[in-house]
């Protein structure tokens, strides 16, 4: 098993080898020293990312693999996740760059130098591309060091019950002052969160402040500088981080190298271009205090290999024959009405009334009578519906050789093109399809992906507007997704559809890829899609991308010549043209030259913005509620269906006492699919406020401490594998402080030990009898909020997620970076991104990062409308922060509101959304013609709710301003024009533009 040993071994070899030369000798003297301690526990303390912590692998595309220090992880499941990291070919392209010091830095001097990201003349820190031959050779990476591109203020500040430090603004950084008497010493009782550290606010000056004062570019507790790339770095490329002498401590002295030279001697060759790169900034090696190198991972190789494989090329060429481009089944859609009835489709007219009810099901109470009338008109543009399926190769396993489901941390892709490894299994991908009327040939197609925990049924709101513009819509279920309803709801649903004679279509729609993940007999869509099992989450995203790429191949195969096995014309022969769903002898959609688009919302917005940068066949994409920097989405989202499986797993097992002090009861909280479950375990004696509880993991010999709060409540956790024996100990005296564990109970006798359940417990479908030993019911990291461990783990998570992160693929849209396949095709995709102002689900800051990566937001260029860059303008007006409770702005009633940056209501005189929000003047309007690929590209910034919203507005012509109709008509017009027209026009809001295709009677 690999461990920390290779890193230590390299350190010893270099120490004992003949002295090689560094770039130059380091300066002597005082000043904060860079921390570089490979023996530090629990993890080495070195600047990261760093090629010092990689190992050679001849079959890696970069000749490197990460060494993630497997042995130091306390639990089996964390070791397996770290082992998956060891397979990655290099460091992150978006992940933070961190370096710790022996003493605090002068943060005001640092922020003064780094105020303007585009002005690098006097920066203290640089990151250069030092790979000769790279298109970005010697170009500096733009960095955020507190300029506001990555706000730390979370929309939902609550991260589960009984937090010892409540009302923190961030998941990652401390805000509480524990040194109550200001003596600089941890006095008894001051360590209220029992982390073994005297906490101070993570603000610029370390003093208590408001929400805007918390900083994310520096961690006071560890003296760690945290730099965030503003744009994705290039894949499989070596970079140098250069700390200049301008980076100083509080005494004004420059930071120092930990070595006799300004670099580790093993990296001198890799850093050979640093002097040349520094000269571009009028600097030289004499200006350098310390430098190190790192190599980014390859992020495109799997997509290239799989797509080429589908076309019979490259190391995975077998995929073409094993998975030919074909529709596997055409599901029954309606009852037969006599001989010759095509039961594989439902005519649009037969579906119309049901479609209206389904839209009400999807849209809820927002669907008004006016909405229904408008929707009925759109649905009249649909010729027929169908429910095809395809078989798609899945590159990660679900079960072991005996058919038992694998833990999620073992459900990772067995895909390594350079080694010729591609283990696949078959999985049926169900789809829901609508084909427009008035076709003069095969219809263009938009592939629509639903939101997280949704299904292909969500595409119904898109189908009518797309059909009006002559576009067919295919909704597909992403990995692990489908309609998640219980038997009673299924019966109700079936009863409704039976009235319309299309029960078979309803049954086909209900077939999905979701399954019961928590033992309640109800499918749990998406429960494992975004979770703390990060390599698995990465691979669910990648697999969904592969499914979409395969669907594109299927659509392109409808060439008007090939036949398929489906006898839709009922002549008893397999002579129907592939793609002829209605049996009229003509291909209905797709084909070699027909435009193909992609769209989706939330998860679908993430998927369409990802695959839009991967698949060359897309003419245009329309991601709604999209975002990049996936680890940031996970850490900052307010969506419970993501917070529970991801963030709660980081805290779990979360032991709570919530009903003290009279009758305290110990309970535990875990994720339950996309929800959480809390079960009571045992009664406890009265817990005096300020007393201490210790939870021990008897298997790992690890423990954590917590202090009983003033109200008698308690919260504590310990890292655990499922099944580990645990023991709660209660103490009535102060225990010595200890870092990591929080306290040291050695030699002190607890007043009470709880290691047994005093009642029957039901957990995720399992009954545990009273008298059973206290165990961990599931895996959990047992982390604390606002801790360096949490921050480091999320940084590792971003490294694991890079190959599935849309922001990494956005530069491919317009060819700013080139992605070319074996058939010579190159990605050139027109994109219109539609994030929602103040989105708390896919935080608007992550959509902002995606827009920046795509080139739709400029960091360097001054926009004459504002006298600053568009990016800086959005930061300054609070758009990037996107949290109204900070009260940057209030309405006439004094209620907190967000700034409206695009002012879409101004498209029509007299339109009013009624929000009374401040409006940016002039509106931002981040879209326009593309010089590189033609057409129109960019982003819209709709304002749906003054507090922000993670949803799409239902069209309602009865409103003074109908944002829903405007956006759907913009979507239809954009894709219908091949990505050339963005109809921010009054007639689009009223659905009556003279250039709109007429709605059939």
Question: Where are the regions that the model predicts?
Answer:
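C-terminal motif of bacterial Sec signal peptides marking the signal peptidase cleavage site
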Residues: 14-15
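Acidic, glycine-anchored loop motifs typical of Ca2+
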Residues: 171-204, 501-525, 560-589, 714, ...
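N-terminal cap/lid segment of alpha/beta-hydrolase-fold proteins
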Residues: 350-441
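Cap/lid segment of the alpha/beta-hydrolase catalytic domain
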Residues: 395-420, 428, 440-443, 447-567
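Primarily recognizes the serine-hydrolase "nucleophile elbow" in alpha/beta-hydrolase
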Residues: 573-636
